[in-house]
């Protein structure tokens, strides 16, 4: 009997008379667990922030290795199990989509803000008050950032180059920034109209990776570049090209799976072969009749896209053939050369063809060949960037670096304003938000002050990664900014503090604003969670 009483009394702990659940510590424990997991993710990428940041080597289950210091790439490939840690991975992805750069900064800021939240919660401040105060702080922060930004014109090539170079400085391929930065700026400028553009469709800039050579061999091509080889090597150069793109096969038609053809003697066999020959010859004649002298053939999985007989006839008619065109490349090809995809031979007419000055197969010094189509008459503005490198790791990191540089220029097209780099905006925010907190009262002032202190993590981490003393560096920066020197930032090259605008370390305003707002939104979301429930 006493055992029964003990059991019933144990089951009633945590419940009051009305049967409502009362576990005072549980929400606090859940918050602490969420904050700890998210901070662990932020700490993992913190060392890769800035031009002197370290790189990460990531190995997947297949054994493939990636070397990078791009925050979005590191987090995307990281195995994260905790739900709130996954929120930081999503945060990095959101920053990558919105701005394309600042993917490490946004996670580091979020980690520092969560640390501040933890301290505020331990002092008994309610999560809702912290959340609302952080929203006030970020609204004020956006005002401060906008006030310290400088307008930029898209015609000012020098400023665009400085922004792209700053983005490339923290990458593995930073020593090639003098080549890759102008390439990125030129690529964006060729696919937009600077007077009217409000955004850039990066699908108009195709990055082609080709193994061999060095990054010095990267080039920008106004036109189309294909990694597929020319099928008939006797026709490898065509001037005044008329280009057709077919989505059907130049091979004998196959019977259905269920049907069979029984050939009883050799005359019937001969007739089948003659029919096949006539069928293919008619198709090739129709292609030639339309005036086509360069033919692209989409990859087919059902049967041979191009039979040997068809290739023989095309060769005789001096038509250059490139087969195995991938389905996802078709839209870009059509936009670049002004052709239309042809699904049936009956639709193969002159108006479906695209035109170009020159189509040729180019040899790459013993490391394969590329097909280049230049002088395209199409109104669709597109460019191709050929990325070369000695191995797969270098090529992939170069591609990511070029993508980040393109995104930086896209940010300047979207919001035409620049801001200093080198931790200057974050320290300016910390100083101005500390002043703003004095105008508030009660708990809000305390929370905004904690928010401003958290932003010091960026200059502190930059200094730490560059081998400087973070405490003395941040203290000196605070003094300079308090005296009104808004552009004082960490000069990683010289190892000290200087006017960062004079050093041409600049970044788009959109990157800073996006990082601040997205990090704050994520922190507020994590802060509001007081329970984790496993669904069935």
From Swiss-Prot:
Q: Where is this region: Disordered?
A: 1-26
- Catalytic activity from the UniProt record: ATP + H2O = ADP + phosphate + H(+)
The family database entries (Gene3D superfamilies) matched by this protein are listed as:
GroEL, GroEL-like equatorial domain, TCP-1-like chaperonin intermediate domain
Q: Which UniProt keywords apply?
A: ATP-binding, Chaperone, Cytoplasm, Hydrolase, Magnesium, Metal-binding, Nucleotide-binding
Q: Where does Mg(2+) bind?
A: 101
Instruction: Provide the primary localization.
Output: cytoplasm
- Stretches with biased composition (Polar residues): 1-15
Family statement: Belongs to the TCP-1 chaperonin family.
Under which name does UniProt file this protein? T-complex protein 1 subunit delta
Q: Which organism is it from?
A: Takifugu rubripes
- Protein's gene: cct4
């Amino acid at each position: 009997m006493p055992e029964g009483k003990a059991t019933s009394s144990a089951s009633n702990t945590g419940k009051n008379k009305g049967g409502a659940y009362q576990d005072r510590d549980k929400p606090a424990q859940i918050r602490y667990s969420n904050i700890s997991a998210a901070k662990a993710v932020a700490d993992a990428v913190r060392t890769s922030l800035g031009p002197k940041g370290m790189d990460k080597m990531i190995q997947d289950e297949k054994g493939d290795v990636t070397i990078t210091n791009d925050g979005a790439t590191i987090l995307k490939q990281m195995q994260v199990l905790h739900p709130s840690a996954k929120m930081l991975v999503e945060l990095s992805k959101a920053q990558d989509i919105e701005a394309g750069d600042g993917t490490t900064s946004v996670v580091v800021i979020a980690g520092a803000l969560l640390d501040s939240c933890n301290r505020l919660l331990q002092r008994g401040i309610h999560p809702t008050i912290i959340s609302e105060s952080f929203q006030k702080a970020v609204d004020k922060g956006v005002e401060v950032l906008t006030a310290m930004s400088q307008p930029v014109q898209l015609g000012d090539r020098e400023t665009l180059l400085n922004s792209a170079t700053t983005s490339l400085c923290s990458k593995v391929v930073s020593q090639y920034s003098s080549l890759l930065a102008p390439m990125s700026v030129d690529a964006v400028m060729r696919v937009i109209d600077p007077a009217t553009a409000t955004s850039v469709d990066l699908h108009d800039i195709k990055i082609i990776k080709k193994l061999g050579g060095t990054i010095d061999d990267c080039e920008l091509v106004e036109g189309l570049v294909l990694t597929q080889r020319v099928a008939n090597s006797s026709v490898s150069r065509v001037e005044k090209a008329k280009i057709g793109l077919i989505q059907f096969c130049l091979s004998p038609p196959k019977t259905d799976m269920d049907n069979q053809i029984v050939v009883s003697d050799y005359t019937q066999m001969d007739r089948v072969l003659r029919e096949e020959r006539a069928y293919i010859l008619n198709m090739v004649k129709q292609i030639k009749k339309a005036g086509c002298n360069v033919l692209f053939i989409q990859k087919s999985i059902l049967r041979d896209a191009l039979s040997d007989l068809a290739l023989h006839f095309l060769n005789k008619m001096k038509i250059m053939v490139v087969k195995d065109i991938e389905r996802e490349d078709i839209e870009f090809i059509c936009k670049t050369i002004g052709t239309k995809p042809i699904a049936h031979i009956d639709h193969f007419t002159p108006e479906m063809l695209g035109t170009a000055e020159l189509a040729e197969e180019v040899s790459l010094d013993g490391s394969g060949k590329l097909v280049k189509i230049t002088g395209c008459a199409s109104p669709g503005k597109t460019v191709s960037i050929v990325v070369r490198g000695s191995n797969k790791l270098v090529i992939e990191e170069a591609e990511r670096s070029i993508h980040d540089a393109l995104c930086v220029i896209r940010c300047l097209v979207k919001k035409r304003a620049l801001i200093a780099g080198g931790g200057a905006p974050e320290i300016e925010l910390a100083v101005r938000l500390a002043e703003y907190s004095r105008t508030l009262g009660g708990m809000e002032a305390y929370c905004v002050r904690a928010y401003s202190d958290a932003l010091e993590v960026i200059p502190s981490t930059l200094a730490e990664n560059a081998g400087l003393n973070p405490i003395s560096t941040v203290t000196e920066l605070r003094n300079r900014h308090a005296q009104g020197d808004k552009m004082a930032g960490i000069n990683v090259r010289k190892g000290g503090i200087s006017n960062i605008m004079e050093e041409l370390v600049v970044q788009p305003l959109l990157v800073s604003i996006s990082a601040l707002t997205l990090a704050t939104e994520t922190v507020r979301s994590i802060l509001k969670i007081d329970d984790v429930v496993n669904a069935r």
